Amino acid sequence: MAASNKIHLLKDLLILSRFNKYTPVFASFAGLWSTLLAGAARLAEHPSAISPAFVLRQTGLCFLAAYIFYGAGTVWNDWVDRDVDANVARTKDRPLASGKVTTFQAMLWMVLQTLATWYLLNVMLDGNDLYVLNPLHALMIAVHRIKNGRGTDGCTYRWKHFLPVLVASFLYPFGKRPAARKLYVYPQYILGFIVAWPAVIGWAATYGQHQPFTETVRQCLPLCSMVYFWIIYLNTAYSYQDVADDRKMNVNSFYNLGGQHLHLLLVALASPVPVCMLLFLREFDSFWLWATWLGGWTASFAEQLIHFDPKEPASGGTLHKSNFMLGIWTIFACAVELLRSASKV
């Protein structure tokens, strides 16, 4: 009986983190694209500096870190929103809202996921394979660095990458409150930043401390901006599925800004995406990227906006799934670009 209860609890915790759905993968897209393309760029600049295997390893670690941290963020979101979720048809069965998971269990689960993310971030930004194989050895190295006065610099470097998304994840659920609307703050603003920021981490995972933090941010700014507007666009359509319940509960969401002109709002939100994409891709001398990114995204956006129907809120879910496939396609395009760069070495 005890074993059965533990299995049910584990299942509920996984559901609480949305690990039973495809949505956590969205949090990894920017990091994956950035890691792969940074690898392709560095191979082109300094072929002997890294190997494709290293880039793929860093890509895998970036995926795990973003995926797990998304889970931690949803735990915090659901805890803050538990009373609201209990009165919304789509969310009333979530583990915290339904009482299947206690606050203590949820908070412990959230802390464990946050610590796991921090550990993976340390591995990525240090680039040390031994950290994966032997955590005790990693601790010994950290102590040795501190004794020699080199521990704080590395820690500060890693915190620069982790703290922004940590703070944004904390603030996200409060962006849905009516008070936030008075300040013209919508949750999609914060969510866009959360999903876009891993692009900086992914680029740093390839270039490491060979590149200053400010230069990494500058390099990734067009990609971060592109992902930022993309997430606001697709999440506005996705959250519109709950429009009836949200209005009853006075939940703040960006689609309220569109009023009766939601379709035009989505067009306006989608428009900056290809512009930011152009700014990012101009750094790469690759027809393949121009064709697969700009061509693929433009065609997909046109199809999405044609089929979205404000009279059918469920069409927002279809648009969301279409963008998920677009993200998967872009991973493939970036992986091919990495292989193309490796073949020229």
UniProtKB/Swiss-Prot annotation:
Keywords of the record: Membrane, Transferase, Transmembrane, Transmembrane helix
Membrane topology category: Multi-pass membrane protein
GO molecular function, one term: transferase activity, transferring alkyl or aryl (other than methyl) groups
Function field: Polyprenyl transferase; part of the gene cluster that mediates the biosynthesis of diterpenoid pyrones. The first step of the pathway is the synthesis of the alpha-pyrone moiety by the polyketide synthase dpmpA via condensation of one acetyl-CoA starter unit with 3 malonyl-CoA units and 2 methylations. The alpha-pyrone is then combined with geranylgeranyl pyrophosphate (GGPP) formed by the GGPP synthase dpmpD through the action of the prenyltransferase dpmpC to yield a linear alpha-pyrone diterpenoid.
Cofactor(s) essential for the protein: Mg(2+)
Residues making up the signal peptide according to the UniProt record: none
Family recorded in the similarity comment: Belongs to the UbiA prenyltransferase family.
GO biological process: terpenoid biosynthetic process
PANTHER family: 4-HYDROXYBENZOATE POLYPRENYLTRANSFERASE, MITOCHONDRIAL (PTHR11048:SF28), PRENYLTRANSFERASES (PTHR11048)
Segments passing through the bilayer: 24-44, 60-80, 101-121, 183-203, 220-240, 261-281, 286-306, 319-339
Subcellular location: Membrane
Primary location class: membrane
Native source organism of the sequence: Macrophomina phaseolina (strain MS6) (Charcoal rot fungus)
The protein's annotated pathway: Secondary metabolite biosynthesis; terpenoid biosynthesis
Gene: dpmpC
A single GO cellular-component term on record: plasma membrane
Entry's EC annotation: 2.5.1.-
Superkingdom of the organism of origin: Eukaryota
Biotechnology: Diterpenoid pyrones display various biological activities and FDDP C shows anti-cancer and anti-HIV activities. FDDP C also shows inhibitory activity of 42-mer-amyloid beta aggregation that is involved in the pathogenesis of Alzheimer's disease.
Listed name of the protein: Polyprenyl transferase dpmpC
Gene3D superfamilies: UbiA prenyltransferase
Classification of source organism: Eukaryota, Fungi, Dikarya, Ascomycota, Pezizomycotina
